[in-house]
Design a protein with these regions (language model features):
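Short terminal hydrophobic/aromatic SLiMs and anchors at protein ends
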Residues: 4-5, 9
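Well-ordered secondary-structure scaffolds
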Residues: 24-294
Length: 294
C-alpha cells in the first residue's frame, strides 16, 4: 500500500509543487479537525496534497480516535497510519509538512488562513451554518454540509446527509438542510447519540470500542449517569474531564456492534473526502497549482 501511494505522490509532484518544502502539489487549509474533516484530510493526503487543519483550543470531536483534533490535546496522533502533529507557528507548520505529517493548529478564526494563503479552503466545521468562511478566502473554497451556498460564500458544497447523494458535489445551491436527526444506521437514528444528562464535568467514561447493552452507563455527569438507549459498540466519547452542558452530544453508539471498524474513518467520511477531491480537481487543474505564500 505504501508503494502505491508513494508512486502516485511522486507522479503528482511532477506537475506542481507549492512553497511548503516540496511536499505536495497543492496546499489545502481545512477548518475543523473532527472525524469527517479527518476523513477528508486522509483522502487528500494520500493523493499527495499538503493539508493543514485548524480547530478549537478544546476540541469537541466525539469520535476522537479517528480525529486529527486529538493532536491539539496530545501533541501528536495517528489515524490509518497518517500522523498529525500540533503546530503553533508557521515554521512548525512547514516543518510538519516537510516530514509528510499533517499540522493541526489552534485557530478559532482565520488568522493562520490569512497568513498561509492556501490554494484551497475546506470548511469542515460542520456547524450547520457558516462561521466566517468567504468565497474570497482562496481560489477554491468548499463548504461541507448545510449552511453554505455554492456561488455565494463558497465555490462548491459537498453533501453530508446519508443516502443517495452523500458526497455529491454541488456547484450551485446548498446541501440538504439539517433535520436535527442523525442518519439511520441499523434502524436507529437519534437513539445512537449519547447526550449529557446535565451541566458539569464528564467523568467515568467507558473506552471507545466498548461493547454496550441498552441501559448501560457510558459516563457520569454531576453524579447523573449517561446511559445508552441501544446495544452496540461505543464508537465515540468526549474526553474525560471536559465541561459539558445538558443535551450536548457526548458520545455515539453504533448498533452494528463488532461489525464496525471503529478505529478507521467511516464510510461517510470517505465519501465526503472523495467529493472534496473531485471539487478540487474541478477548480484547480494540477498543472496550474502553485502555492505563492510569499
Amino acid at each position: 500500500m505504501e508503494s502505491y501511494y508513494g508512486f502516485h505522490y511522486r507522479r503528482n509532484l511532477a506537475f506542481c509543487q507549492n512553497s511548503f518544502g516540496k511536499e505536495g502539489f497543492m496546499f489545502v487549509f481545512i477548518r475543523g479537525a473532527g472525524d469527517l474533516a479527518t476523513g477528508i484530510s486522509i483522502r487528500l493526503h494520500r493523493a499527495g496534497i499538503s493539508v493543514c487543519h485548524s480547530d478549537l483550543a478544546i476540541p469537541t470531536a466525539v469520535r476522537r480516535n479517528v480525529a486529527f483534533s486529538e493532536a491539539i490535546r496530545l501533541g501528536e496522533c495517528s489515524v490509518e497510519g497518517i500522523t498529525a502533529v500540533r503546530a503553533d507557528t508557521v515554521e512548525e507548520i512547514e516543518a510538519a509538512l516537510a516530514e509528510r505529517k499533517v499540522p493541526v493548529i489552534v485557530d478559532e478564526g482565520k488568522e493562520f488562513l490569512h497568513k498561509l494563503k492556501p490554494d484551497a479552503v475546506v470548511d469542515a466545521i460542520l456547524a450547520k451554518r457558516n462561521l466566517g468562511t468567504a468565497i474570497t478566502d482562496a481560489r477554491a473554497v468548499i463548504g461541507i454540509g448545510p449552511g453554505f451556498t455554492a456561488g455565494v460564500d463558497c465555490h462548491a458544497v459537498v453533501e453530508t446527509k446519508r443516502g443517495h447523494d452523500l458526497g455529491r458535489v454541488l456547484l450551485e445551491g446548498s446541501a440538504i438542510p439539517n433535520t436535527g436527526i442523525p442518519g439511520i444506521i441499523g434502524g436507529y437514528g437519534k437513539e445512537r447519540v449519547l447526550r449529557a444528562p446535565a451541566d458539569g464535568i464528564l467523568e467515568k467514561t467507558l473506552p471507545i470500542g466498548t461493547l454496550v447493552k441498552a441501559g448501560d452507563v457510558c459516563a457520569v455527569v454531576n453524579g447523573i449517569p449517561m446511559r445508552t438507549e441501544i446495544a452496540g459498540v461505543l464508537r465515540g466519547m468526549l474526553q474525560e474531564g471536559i465541561t459539558v452542558f445538558a443535551g450536548m452530544k457526548a458520545g455515539d453508539v453504533d448498533p452494528r456492534g463488532e461489525a464496525v471498524e471503529y478505529r478507521n474513518v467511516s464510510d461517510k467520511a470517505r465519501a465526503i473526502g472523495g467529493g472534496v477531491l473531485e471539487a478540487l480537481l474541478h477548480f484547480l487543474p494540477w498543472e496550474l497549482c502553485e502555492n505563492k505564500r510569499n
